[in-house]
Amino acid sequence: MSLLCVRVKRAKFQGSPDKFNTYVTLKVQNVKSTTVAVRGDQPSWEQDFMFEISRLDLGLSVEVWNKGLIWDTMVGTVWIALKTIRQSDEEGPGEWSTLEAETLMKDDEICGTRNPTPHKILLDTRFELPFDIPEEEARYWTYKWEQINALGADNEYSSQEESQRKPLPTAAAQCSFEDPDSAVDDRDSDYRSETSNSFPPPYHTASQPNASVHQFPVPVRSPQQLLLQGSSRDSCNDSMQSYDLDYPERRAISPTSSSRYGSSCNVSQGSSQLSELDQYHEQDDDHRETDSIHSCHSSHSLSRDGQAGFGEQEKPLEVTGQAEKEAACEPKEMKEDATTHPPPDLVLQKDHFLGPQESFPEENASSPFTQARAHWIRAVTKVRLQLQEIPDDGDPSLPQWLPEGPAGGLYGIDSMPDLRRKKPLPLVSDLSLVQSRKAGITSAMATRTSLKDEELKSHVYKKTLQALIYPISCTTPHNFEVWTATTPTYCYECEGLLWGIARQGMRCSECGVKCHEKCQDLLNADCLQRAAEKSCKHGAEDRTQNIIMAMKDRMKIRERNKPEIFEVIRDVFTVNKAAHVQQMKTVKQSVLDGTSKWSAKITITVVCAQGLQAKDKTGSSDPYVTVQVSKTKKRTKTIFGNLNPVWEEKFHFECHNSSDRIKVRVWDEDDDIKSRVKQRLKRESDDFLGQTIIEVRTLSGEMDVWYNLEKRTDKSAVSGAIRLQISVEIKGEEKVAPYHVQYTCLHENLFHYLTDIQGSGGVRIPEARGDDAWKVYFDETAQEIVDEFAMRYGIESIYQAMTHFACLSSKYMCPGVPAVMSTLLANINAYYAHTTASTNVSASDRFAASNFGKERFVKLLDQLHNSLRIDLSTYRNNFPAGSPERLQDLKSTVDLLTSITFFRMKVQELQSPPRASQVVKDCVKACLNSTYEYIFNNCHDLYSRQYQLKQELPPEEQGPSIRNLDFWPKLITLIVSIIEEDKNSYTPVLNQFPQELNVGKVSAEVMWHLFAQDMKYALEEHEKDHLCKSADYMNLHFKVKWLHNEYVRDLPVLQGQVPEYPAWFEQFVLQWLDENEDVSLEFLRGALERDKKDGFQQTSEHALFSCSVVDVFTQLNQSFEIIRKLECPDPSILAHYMRRFAKTIGKVLMQYADILSKDFPAYCTKEKLPCILMNNVQQLRVQLEKMFEAMGGKELDLEAADSLKELQVKLNTVLDELSMVFGNSFQVRIDECVRQMADILGQVRGTGNASPDARASAAQDADSVLRPLMDFLDGNLTLFATVCEKTVLKRVLKELWRVVMNTMERMIVLPPLTDQTGTQLIFTAAKELSHLSKLKDHMVREETRNLTPKQCAVLDLALDTIKQYFHAGGNGLKKTFLEKSPDLQSLRYALSLYTQTTDTLIKTFVRSQTTQGSGVDDPVGEVSIQVDLFTHPGTGEHKVTVKVVAANDLKWQTAGMFRPFVEVTMVGPHQSDKKRKFTTKSKSNNWAPKYNETFHFLLGNEEGPESYELQICVKDYCFAREDRVLGLAVMPLRDVTAKGSCACWCPLGRKIHMDETGLTILRILSQRSNDEVAREFVKLKSESRSTEEGS
């Protein structure tokens, strides 16, 4: 769909001027339009028409018709083929065409004309280019149209020539955006006016009614764009609007070969570098590697970047008017051939990147790359190429702001970065180019044709002089007096009868006009002029002369007092002095002539009315209209029951008085009896619905005007408006424009003069106060001019306001203008939207009745809205943060946007216009997108400029790299500058929507979103190679974290979400932790070596541990502090870090403990050193607990917590082991002390009675006995209490207590319980009584071991003393521990056994040893036994009968005769006088002998059977030598007691098993060598299987 613009200018006819009253009709594609009718042989229409064209094979038919009384006749016609019409966005001078008499038809369609006539018509026809299309592109398309037209009927097209020419972006690409998810693709679709919505750009192949020419999507970066960023670019900045449009897919619209560049235009105003995005799209595979990019910021351009230049073979069309001025701003490079080749390295990079199997996707396919990945393609490719050529020379150096430190993976990490500048500097000062912007809407928006229409300007100049030389504001008021009529007289104003007998009304004493008292204020005509007119008509020459002289004097005074007014008028219309003087004379004379020589023909068409009052009971009215001019009155027909009637009735009047008024009144016709009676009594029987009084002097030319209906009196109920088409032919002024057009011409020219000529493009804002300050448009002189003109010719104040608003729209970016425009539009809104109780006309209908033109104003607002949106999309550039004035303009611009939204909602009554807050938010986001793109692409330069760095880097190293991370901190710094500027400068200004828009937060959100995409992909690339040091990654992590926490974390849109940035760095943090573990272990070894060299000195007098512990945990805490300061918000990732760090802690501490444990025995001979080393281990445990709490304590990850708890247990075990080793190191010295104690104890004599003397003596003896031990303990325990940590001290005390107790038991009371050698000697030596002497020798002076009761009492007292000593009044071991100590209990039990009889000990043995028989596990045979237990009922004595039945499966090897027999022994108390042992006969060489022998044991009645047991022993009888034991079994009689008898197979074990109690009893009994029962018992329980022969 294309837009055809036709301007019907003038015509020249042959013939008498009186016979022509012509109009022109235009026909194309079944659409017909008609001009107004104009008289004369050289009529001038100057009317514009627009048509939507979908078929270019048709033509435009132009017919000129002459109006007749009955029918119209055709003067001539002309047919113009649409293919021949030029393409242009500028109006041309037009072409004269000869009118022909006949038309030629073909297939029912006009195809040409014939038979020329002498008449000619001037037409300007053109196809309009898309709004704001770049000038170069306009030339290109115009050239293409001309080229196509030049081909003629053959319609051939040279594809070869086309392929050689540089293609331009498609126009469709500028007017639409195909992304269905775009946040901005429908910004204008729901509120565009009918006019703007019906003219789609001519380059679309299909109609796109919603395609807004000012849409600007968020930029989309593609890999193709980024590959081309290294190619040559020419950029040219110009002044007008531009947008940023990217195209993810190709648009198949261009008539050339497929366009390879999308229109990548800036959201920026012309001068912004912020949005100078190097984004290009390749769409032609043949040209991918050879074409270069030219980006041009062109006037009226939707596209700043990506515009390919023309080749020299394409001559641009002639540029006229505004285009010439702007073309002059273009650099010379624009005119050179832009077809260049990219550098070889770019081609190489592209080839390398694509690889043999890689290629870009099809043009219409979606890109496989994310936005962030695209940034990296070029950087990664370059570095990989360089890595292939240049060997890696080590890790890159840290950025200057990163301190290099020891322990590579640990130090040099800045965990608390603050990237904000100490002195904020607006980044826009660095990002903006020199501003050369021409403020205002593009020429297509605010075309002011009145500036070029000299004929109209000349007429307006005269009318302005006429209005100002004798202004209405200075007219002479009437001199009214109360007057009595003697004859029936009618009011001059309302034509009503002056009722009454006397004093009926008012009469002016000067001019004689009569009216009602209520009507005198409605008579505002000048009294002098009225008097002059009347005198002239009645021949009162003298009186007339006097009046004329008075008027002359007044005009002279006016000219003398206000010369500046007429000078301004002369300057505005550029009239030379001589002509001005002559014109002043002419104007004065016309004023003096008044209406005496004035006449006009007036044609009034009553078209329709809207919103009338309902007067009938039915809620409706039956309106008709009366029109009165002078004394002539006419009326329309009645429209019944309609409040929005349409009459379409035309009336003709002749008027000879310029001061006359046209009185248009609307009535409600009543046809009932009441109205008929009223007709008889009153002139006005019908109900009054409203009136409008039109001054004839305010009429000019053809007017189509809506007039608001007004009241006659305060009692009138009036509403609505009436539409009148008025045609006025004033004698001598037949061809002038309507006064509204004339006022527009005056206002626009005055505005142009004051701003562009006097103000050099700046708008002077008048100072005005009060409620009507918005009606003051200029300074005093200029304001008086427009006000007087408006007053004279009836221009409504709202029309003045809308006209001034339209003028300001072309300068809306000048300082102070947005505020004025906002106020103006707010008052315009109030005028239309704020209805009163007296009117029921909707705001939309009132606006539709505007004389300014509904479509015109709506289109103006639509275009202004788009332009404002564009400028807000580059607010950082257009409204610098460093300029308070521009910031105020920014605030006013948003207010203006809000007013436009209010207008659309309340005045246009659109259903859902875009909310101003959302529009501003979208604009802010668009600006931030382009800002980020720019700082990303120019990061090094901007950073160097902002921080005055002199570092020069080659272009390929300025961007992101996989060999270093220098780029990213710089980018973060720039991002922070942007966010800070938005937060501190723009947020306080853009505060109109506090609930919906916070610029600082939006800035942080957008910047973080874009940065996150790039950062994520960058780190994915780094993961592949890990070319940077882990400390560098950690530093970057901290900066990213700081950026997130400072600006992003609290954003509402991210509340409740787990940030994703920790996941980007997880692998690098784990890598750092791996390296840190190695560093920590190395550090540990070094710390221990240093500590060892220093002799493990205490760190201070109060600290009981050495430096190595402090060093180790200082290093671990530093490492953990880095992890902690990461403040990882992702619990799962933090858990990974904690698990890994827990492993490091475990390795380090366990290696420390292992090293100490290994060397510890060597240090035990020194006094303090072992204690310090144990203190070190204990301090490890203390610090580990603190670190556990620091890492989260109960909140710590379960796996990490378990690891640390397990480590704590291990360290506890280590400390126990070291304490044991340390305690055992005192064994030799304690042995010596205890030996001395034993000697002293052996000298104690006396009985163990309980007399006081005996107790005192025992206490003294105990002190004497303890002296050797106490001397030793005093010296050492005092040292330990000083040197050891409390926990270590207790462990050392426990070990010493253990050693002392065991040694006393072993050396004083019994052989040591754990001395298996001694036990074995007991077993072996007791095998036969003849060897007891060996046992005695081993136990050293057995007589001393057989402690007397006195000695036991002394020893018991000594134990109490030792216990109190180790308790140390609560500073040592706890009493509970000491009392329950198994060592003490064992010793005391042994002592208690010393005083018991042999029978008691044996009974205790039998009752306590329940598991003596262990042959079940490894039996060496079995014996069948039958036991019967009898208890005498009288005496209670027990008799046991034992029958040895047989033996079986005896395991024995012997070289000689094997003669097994069974020995049965009764073990128990009170057996000294009874037979205790029986033996069976031996059986020769029988391993399963049968005995069947019965034995009887008699037990006393002192004890029950549970105190006795049978011990069965199978032996091999040997003659002349000791019998050898095969196996033993024990049968407690307690098992037989319940049943009374038992028969079983008893397995034979190798020896008797007993616990410590049994061994103790055995040892005590072994010392009673004179007791036969004891000696026999020891021998019996000490027996074990003899060694077999041959084994």
UniProtKB/Swiss-Prot annotation:
Organism: Homo sapiens
GO process terms (BP): acrosomal vesicle exocytosis; cellular response to glucose stimulus; chemical synaptic transmission; dense core granule priming; neuronal dense core vesicle exocytosis; positive regulation of apoptotic process; positive regulation of inhibitory postsynaptic potential; positive regulation of protein secretion
Keywords from the UniProt entry: Calcium, Cell membrane, Coiled coil, Cytoplasm, Exocytosis, Membrane, Metal-binding, Phosphoprotein, Repeat, Synapse, Zinc, Zinc-finger
Cofactor(s) this protein cannot do without: Ca(2+)
Subcellular location: Cytoplasm; Membrane; Cell membrane; Synapse
InterPro entries in alphabetical order: C1-like_sf, C2_dom, C2_domain_sf, MUN_dom, Munc13_1, Munc13_dom-2, PE/DAG-bd, Unc-13
This protein's name: Protein unc-13 homolog B
Gene behind the chain: UNC13B
Gene Ontology CC terms, in alphabetical order: cytosol; Golgi apparatus; membrane; neuromuscular junction; plasma membrane; presynaptic active zone; presynaptic membrane; synaptic vesicle membrane
Family: Belongs to the unc-13 family.
Binding positions (Ca(2+) 1): 616, 622, 668, 670
Biased composition (Polar residues): 230-242, 254-276
Coiled-coil boundaries: 1172-1202
